């Protein structure tokens, strides 16, 4: 009797072990578990891709950001530098974001380039006129004159107004001390005068510290 009970216990233990193993094996291969695992992996990959795309887009946006420029800013700079083309002023203001900085760059002799994609209207007209003159064969001289006219009207070839002319225009004495003036207490004309004086002083300081600039003034 004892042998039969022991044998029955062994059989039940083996059967229970097999049943548990079979149950666990089925759970691992169950389609719902596989789908859930795949979904979580897919969601994780999608989130990573979205984050990477967002970072790349934000970096690209930062590179393309240009400071906003309105007509009032351009008008103020052009009143101080009337020989500058509005597109030159706009392009520089987009980089500096400051009227004062742009004026200082101009008065200190910095080059004020046009936007890379800018094409003056006179240049297109000059090229077409040159083609017509050459096709008639009657006028190499006329073609040259047209070229010279288009060059003189091309705003990129105009000589910039000198800083000394601005001193006269706004009645600014370089020897006068305006450092104690508060721009907030001044009128628009007085602010322009102060800006010219500040730019002149800044330029003088740069010339004093640069042998290259000193050589250009000799």
UniProtKB/Swiss-Prot annotation:
Gene Ontology, cellular component aspect: endoplasmic reticulum membrane
UniProt superkingdom: Eukaryota
CUE domain location: 69-111
A GO term, aspect molecular function: ubiquitin binding
Cytoplasmic-side segments: 26-218
Lumenal side: 1-4
Positions of the UniProt region annotated as Disordered: 35-65, 105-160
SMART domains: CUE
Biased composition (Low complexity): 39-59, 121-153
Pfam families named among the record's database cross-references: CUE, Cue1_U7BR
Keyword Transmembrane appears in the UniProt entry: yes
Coarse class of the protein's main subcellular location: endoplasmic reticulum
Subcellular localization: Endoplasmic reticulum membrane
Summary of the function given for this chain in its UniProt record: Component of the endoplasmic reticulum-associated protein degradation (ERAD) pathway. Recruits the soluble ubiquitin-conjugating enzyme UBC7 to the cytoplasmic face of the endoplasmic reticulum membrane where it functions in degradation of misfolded or regulated proteins localized in the endoplasmic reticulum (ER) lumen or membrane via the ubiquitin-proteasome system.
Subunit text: Forms a heterodimer with UBC7.
Family: Belongs to the CUE1 family.
Listed name of the protein: Coupling of ubiquitin conjugation to ER degradation protein 1
Natural source organism: Kluyveromyces lactis (strain ATCC 8585 / CBS 2359 / DSM 70799 / NBRC 1267 / NRRL Y-1140 / WM37) (Yeast)
Gene name linked to the record: CUE1
């Amino acid at each position: 009797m004892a042998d039969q009970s022991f044998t029955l216990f062994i059989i039940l233990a083996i059967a229970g072990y097999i049943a548990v193993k079979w149950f666990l094996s089925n759970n691992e291969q169950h389609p719902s578990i596989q789908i859930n695992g795949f979904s979580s992996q897919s969601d994780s990959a999608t989130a990573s891709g979205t984050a990477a795309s967002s970072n790349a887009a934000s970096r690209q946006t930062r590179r393309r950001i240009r400071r906003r420029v309105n007509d009032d800013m351009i008008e103020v700079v052009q009143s101080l530098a009337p020989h500058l083309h509005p597109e030159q002023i706009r392009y520089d203001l987009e980089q500096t974001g400051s009227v004062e900085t742009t004026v200082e760059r101009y008065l200190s002799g910095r080059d004020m380039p046009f936007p890379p994609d800018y094409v003056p209207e006179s240049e297109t007209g000059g090229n077409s006129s040159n083609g017509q003159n050459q096709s008639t064969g009657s006028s190499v001289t006329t073609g040259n004159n047209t070229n010279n006219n288009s060059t003189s009207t091309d705003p990129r070839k105009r000589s910039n107004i000198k800083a000394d002319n601005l001193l006269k225009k706004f009645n600014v004495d370089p020897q006068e001390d305006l450092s104690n003036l508060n721009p907030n207490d001044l009128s628009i004309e007085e602010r322009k005068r102060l800006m010219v004086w500040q730019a002149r002083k800044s330029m003088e300081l740069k010339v004093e510290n640069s042998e290259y600039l000193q050589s250009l003034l000799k």
